[in-house]
UniProtKB/Swiss-Prot annotation:
PANTHER family recorded: ELONGATION FACTOR G 1, TRANSLATION ELONGATION FACTOR G-RELATED
Family statement drawn from the similarity comment of this UniProt entry: Belongs to the TRAFAC class translation factor GTPase superfamily. Classic translation factor GTPase family. EF-G/EF-2 subfamily.
Gene field: fusA2
PROSITE patterns: G_TR_1, G_TR_2
SMART domains: EFG_C, EFG_IV
InterPro entries for the chain: EFG_II (IPR041095), EFG_III (IPR009022), EFG_III/V (IPR035647), EFG_IV (IPR047872), EFG_V (IPR035649), EFG_V-like (IPR000640), EFTu-like_2 (IPR004161), G_TR_CS (IPR031157)
Name recorded for this polypeptide: Elongation factor G 2
An annotated Gene Ontology molecular function: GTPase activity
Organism: Trichodesmium erythraeum (strain IMS101)
Amino acid sequence: MAKDLTNYRNFGIFAHVDAGKTTTTERILKLTGKIHKIGEVHEGAATTDFMEQEQERGITIQSAATSCFWKDHQLNIIDTPGHVDFTIEVYRSLKVLDGGVGVFCGSGGVEPQSETNWRYANDSKVARIIYVNKLDRTGADFYKVVKQVKDVLAAEPLVMVLPIGIENDFVGVVDLLTRKAWVWDDSGDPTKYEIKDVPENMTDDVEKYREMLVETAIEQDDEVMEKYLEGEEPDLDTLKRCIRKGTKDLVFFPTYCGSSFKNKGVQLVLDAVVDFLPNPTEIKPQPEIDLEGNETGKFAYVDPEKPLRALAFKIMDDKYGALTFTRIYSGTLSKGDTVLNTFTGKTERIGRLVEMHADSREEIESAQAGDIVAIVGMKNVQTGHTLCDPKEPATLEPMVFPDPVISIAVAAKDKGSVEKLGMALSKMVQEDPSFRVETDAESNETIIKGMGELHLDIKVDILKRTYGVDVEVGKPQVAYRESITKRLEDSYTHKKQSGGSGQFAKIDYMIEPGEVGTGFDFQSKVTGGNVPREFWPAVQKGFETSFEKGMLAGYPCVDMKFTLMDGAFHPVDSSAIAFEIAAKAAYRQSFSKAAPQLLEPIMKVDVFTPDDHVGDVIGDLNRRRGMIKSQDSAATGSRIKADVPLSEMFGYIGDLRTMTSGRGQFSMEFSHYAPCPANVAEVVIKEAKERQEAKSK
């Protein structure tokens, strides 16, 4: 029997590291009856933080999917990490969600990572509720955070509750819709609360904010607005309908507050998820694409009767085996079904289906459009692959992941672990598309690449803890790039005569800087038959293969354009291989003449510091060759945004803590590539040459 999809809510909880997402999820699970004893993050016992690395560090690394129920609605919750090195997890979960709860710290306000996550959610057009947490904290200020949401995120918070008391005196909230006060006792039991009349000293504020709430909400319905202007107050159901519409259309974001740790305020957030976040049928259907990645004009409609369309959005290995977390967009998926993976072109049989609750699971017979489930034991699937009905194949828009910016060499400490290391790394690549593994062709070293220092630290930790492989770790290496700055026309002739048939190929070509972001670009302007068309791909291949390695320090090249202008061939001695060799030699001949330059990755750095350390932090960023972009006051200090070369940011977290007595925070994400200053390029090139020499000995 088909489930009622209007009673589904697929949503994520996301925020800055330490804003209290995991604690909030724990409280939700307690209230919805999924767990009996609440696990505390600071004790390393939280239900959704189930990797050892997460429990030790107190940060959530993998998005754990959890299903629970509230007021006859099924909630599928994704708990996402807040640390910038794991932003990929946030992006990946937003891709498959219909709504979100953005958690902000009552004292920290809109912190760096909150901004990144908010931007991703805007890009994915995900409706959100705001929850200002930790109002029991010293320095907490609900109204200041609301103002920051407006100023920093350029978003419209719709205040739904007002706090009763603050810091140690925080006891509950006033629900503006009902004009009732929810007051919790200090027993630590979230169900021990009373609903009372509004405290006398708050009535004026309550009326003022309620009027603002009503006037903002009714703008969603002209008819209701007209009646209101004529003096008719909208009833509760009408108001909720208007708020739901505005939330769904991203016009505003219903804003709540509380203290998850003290078990105060979470029920109203759950009510808001049910009342205001969209169900799967209210979301724009996923477009289907062809093999070239172009939209076909068809859509995966949320309907259990339609052909199966599902997206694998996360692969995980746990103690039960390989899990493929899947969002079903249309159709129904049952045990025993055969599905087609459109990326590999292979079919697989579905052995077992499970509904996840953090790291425990419940076996189910089938799932349908709107569900988020895990498939056990799939072999050839990766994140972003589409699973569909083999009789009616279609591909959903895949996920796009950024290139890594940092790499380190790893080697097994003993020979017996070499094979184990290879198997472990291939599983880890399947699980995390922003993590890459390569083998250096010359040194045969295994190189792992990722999004930041912490990202790779955690991977090394996982190798040791989860797979039992001890590794030696090299020094972090920056992913430099090479390019040229000058346009050059040149010619090269490849001749080889050694008895029998020889080799001959002549090419006249132009090499020039390309537009930023174009990568490798090749075209032929040959007219007539001087270079027959059949040899053009060989010329392209020769240039493209060479392009993978620059001549300055051996780093990959970016943004270069190659044009085949003319040339000559011999009817007997010319071949595709001769033209490929000519192009490779031409590249080596011309690269150094075209004013090559080394490019370095520049990171967008966002630092929070208490005001009395601002001078030290700015001075330090300047010493790191940083360019300060802005400085603004935050809730409890200052926000400094800067562009800083990645090579200067190693170990920054330790230095920042020292400078700010442990109170500074920062986030960092890749921004762009920029030319290296000559003195820096000189050192990088020298070190690269020394490494090459050491490898060839």
